[in-house]
């Protein structure tokens, strides 16, 4: 009798909730290095200009600025995607809002990267997906200063 009661309690707590169909979502965050193709440190003015251009082009809304008034986070009001410089202007971060369709996220990612790199290459920079910048020793180590 007690065994049946315990079995029923365990079933109700752990198994029964899995029987209900739930929607499945994925949230993706990607942080990619901005590389100076001249073998030098990343030029932060180039990084910031590329973000400002992408924010304007894709209709993102500015959210946060650093202590010097530079934009470092913006959000798409339709998709909820975020562009940001999390800790430094050496890496560009894209945070995609939760989605049930990874192909939609992939399409947006490709559009963002293509646009950003078309702008960055004009200043001999590029967003790379191959780990850290090979010139990390040359890059400035200062963090973005801002008050929350």
Role assignments for model-derived ranges:
Residues 1-148:
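Terminal catalytic/cofactor-binding subdomain
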């Amino acid at each position: 009798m007690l065994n049946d009661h315990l079995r029923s309690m365990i079933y109700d707590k752990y198994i029964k909730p899995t029987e209900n169909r739930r929607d499945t979502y994925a949230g993706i965050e990607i942080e990619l290095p901005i590389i100076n193709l001249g073998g030098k440190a990343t030029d932060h003015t180039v990084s910031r200009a590329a973000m400002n251009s992408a924010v304007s082009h894709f209709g993102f809304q500015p959210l946060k600025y650093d202590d010097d008034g530079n934009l470092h986070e913006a959000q798409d009001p339709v998709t909820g995607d975020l562009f940001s410089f999390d800790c430094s202007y050496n890496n560009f971060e894209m945070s995609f809002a939760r989605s049930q369709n990874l192909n939609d996220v992939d399409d947006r990612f490709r559009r963002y990267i293509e646009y950003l790199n078309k702008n960055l290459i004009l200043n001999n920079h590029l967003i790379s997906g191959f780990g850290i910048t090979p010139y990390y020793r040359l890059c400035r180590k200062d963090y973005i200063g801002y008050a929350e």
